[in-house]
């Protein structure tokens, strides 16, 4: 974005409200209320706009929606400044100039993200880590059978996925991009979803990554010891220290309870009370430690997900926590690399293959949809290897390879299966299969027809069941004879709306026949039978 890139959200937001077409309005209605309830409650005018029936929206309402979505996602400190403070107070009647100010503020902040973090890192105030480039579950890219260590009885994909060179390339690409942004190589790496394993540990070390991190349950399985009795940490001596993985880098393991308190619990408390609770728990860990024992408490959580659920974006919590940390004599904040410079890690002979979710990979592999996606990916990756054997590593190969590495990202597999639901799984599914099709096209191959078949199995929601037997006239009209029919509305996310052929399916029967009627969105082209 800082270099001028755009996406549909930005394009539709920037478009003059008077020029919005039906597709744009469908997109705005589907996407521009994508905020938490906590955020929505801060802005009554935004909430009122959400409650207003879409078919009564005026051009001004659509412009207000364009503005409100982007206004709501600005930081509270920014919203306290003019002109945004006045805009929030006004609540409605925004102009195109108002909208431009909000969008320009977003762009200005985006351009400052990397320079700000680079300055803070150069001052030694923070350490910026990175993640394998397309956020893959690295052990599964290295070898999908790595899932069996934690899931010995799992049903895995028919075709074993093994691309150790791709796993290494994800690490290399992340390192190269980091150097471009920060002027030096990264020292630390957070593997996607905290996914680690003994087989991939050497990759990090060989690519000069000095430390990685994961969850306490991965440590418990690695050392074969229980760390907690219920929720009470019984082995702080094991958790509160870094380890040196055999043939790999150092590794830190997060305190899951304290991290999850920040991520999921403290948003329900006042910021000061939450900070006091965390500081009290940290002090309890300090007082329980033997004298001269330098214990390290590692807190790791999704940095982008928690704060939108705090009443004030977490401001009060942060200010109170940082004040407590800087004024207390018993605790010191430290970057991972600085800690390792003064403390020798404990040897770890074997690193368990697992993630920070259940210490396994079940979120990304093992269910039917997930396994099917892996099989389709493996088929495309095998086709790419065949292409390389015939044509070498030419420009088309490199482009197709990059596309398939993007398809190796964890988020595609996250949304497959029953364990996660975005509400837009069909869109992610279509995009994933689209990547595979694009790779086949670059290789000069016709994409397999199976890629036209959705992986996501959507349960059909019946909006109305048949009320009575019916024998409608077959005249192409949905008249009174169809009022007793069952009805199934067309479904699909915003990506499908422009492609939708019919609005709903009506169905019913009498003693001799079943009747179907499609309510088309536009005049259909007659089919040749």
Which positions does each model-derived feature cover?
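Active-site and substrate-binding clefts of carbohydrate-active enzymes
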Residues: 1-86, 228-465
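Short, well-structured secondary-structure segments
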Residues: 1-170, 187-191, 210-217, 335
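Long amphipathic alpha-helical scaffold segments
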Residues: 88, 99-111, 120, 125-127, ...
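Acidic-and-aromatic substrate-binding clefts and catalytic sites of carbohydrate-active enzymes
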Residues: 107-109, 190-198, 219-224, 307-308, ...
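Short, surface-exposed basic-aromatic patches at helix termini and helix-loop junctions that form
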Residues: 122, 181-182, 198-213, 315-328
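Surface-exposed loop and adjacent secondary-structure segments within mature catalytic domains
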Residues: 145-150, 198-201, 205-262
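CE4/NodB-like, metal-dependent polysaccharide N-deacetylase domain
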Residues: 152-193, 281-300
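Surface-exposed, glycine/proline- and aromatic-rich loop segments on solvent-exposed faces
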Residues: 479, 483-529
């Amino acid at each position: 974005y800082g270099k001028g890139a755009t996406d549909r959200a930005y394009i539709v937001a920037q478009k003059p409200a008077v020029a919005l077409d039906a597709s744009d309005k469908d997109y705005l209605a589907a996407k521009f209320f994508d905020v938490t309830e906590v955020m929505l409650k801060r802005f009554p005018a935004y909430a009122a706009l959400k409650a207003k029936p879409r078919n009564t929206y005026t051009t001004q309402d659509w412009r207000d929606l364009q503005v409100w979505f982007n206004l709501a996602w600005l930081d509270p400190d920014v919203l306290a400044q003019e002109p945004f403070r006045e805009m929030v107070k006004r609540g409605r009647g925004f102009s195109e100039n108002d909208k431009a100010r909000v969008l320009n503020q977003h762009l200005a902040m985006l351009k400052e993200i990397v320079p700000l973090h680079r300055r803070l890192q150069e001052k030694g105030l923070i350490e910026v880590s990175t993640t394998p480039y397309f956020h893959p579950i690295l052990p599964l890219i290295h070898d999908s059978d790595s899932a069996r260590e934690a899931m010995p009885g799992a049903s895995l994909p028919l075709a074993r996925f093994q691309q150790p060179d791709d796993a290494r390339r994800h690490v290399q690409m992340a390192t190269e991009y980091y150097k471009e942004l920060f002027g030096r190589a990264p020292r630390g790496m957070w593997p996607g979803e905290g996914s680690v394993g003994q087989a991939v540990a050497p990759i990090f070390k060989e690519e000069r990554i000095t430390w990685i991190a994961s969850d306490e349950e991965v440590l418990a399985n690695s050392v074969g010891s229980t760390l907690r009795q219920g929720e009470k940490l019984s082995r702080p001596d094991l958790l509160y220290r870094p380890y040196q993985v055999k043939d790999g880098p150092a590794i830190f393991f997060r305190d899951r309870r304290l991290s999850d308190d920040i991520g999921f619990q403290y948003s329900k408390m006042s910021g000061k009370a939450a900070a006091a609770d965390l500081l009290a728990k940290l002090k309890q860990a300090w007082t329980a430690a033997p004298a001269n024992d330098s214990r390290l408490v590692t807190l790791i959580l999704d940095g982008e997900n928690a704060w939108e659920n705090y009443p004030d974006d977490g401001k009060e919590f942060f200010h109170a926590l940082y004040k407590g940390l800087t004024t207390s004599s018993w605790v010191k904040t430290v970057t991972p690399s600085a800690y390792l410079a003064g403390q020798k890690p404990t040897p770890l002979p074997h690193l368990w293959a697992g993630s920070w979710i259940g210490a396994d990979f079940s979120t990304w592999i093992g269910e039917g949809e997930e396994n099917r996606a892996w099989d389709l990916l493996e088929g495309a990756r095998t086709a790419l290897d065949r292409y390389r054997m015939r044509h070498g590593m030419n420009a088309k190969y490199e482009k197709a390879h990059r596309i398939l590495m993007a398809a190796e990202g964890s988020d595609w597999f996250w949304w497959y299966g029953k364990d996660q639901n975005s509400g837009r799984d069909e869109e992610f599914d279509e995009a994933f299969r689209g990547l595979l099709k694009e790779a086949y096209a670059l290789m000069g191959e016709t994409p397999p027809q199976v890629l036209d078949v959705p992986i996501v199995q959507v349960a059909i929601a019946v909006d109305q069941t048949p009320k009575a037997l019916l024998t409608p006239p077959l005249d192409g009209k949905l008249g009174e004879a169809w009022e007793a029919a069952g009805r199934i509305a067309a479904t699909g996310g915003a990506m499908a709306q422009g492609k939708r052929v019919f609005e709903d399916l009506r169905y019913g029967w009498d003693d001799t026949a079943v009747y179907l009627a499609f309510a088309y969105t536009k005049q259909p082209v007659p089919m040749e039978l």
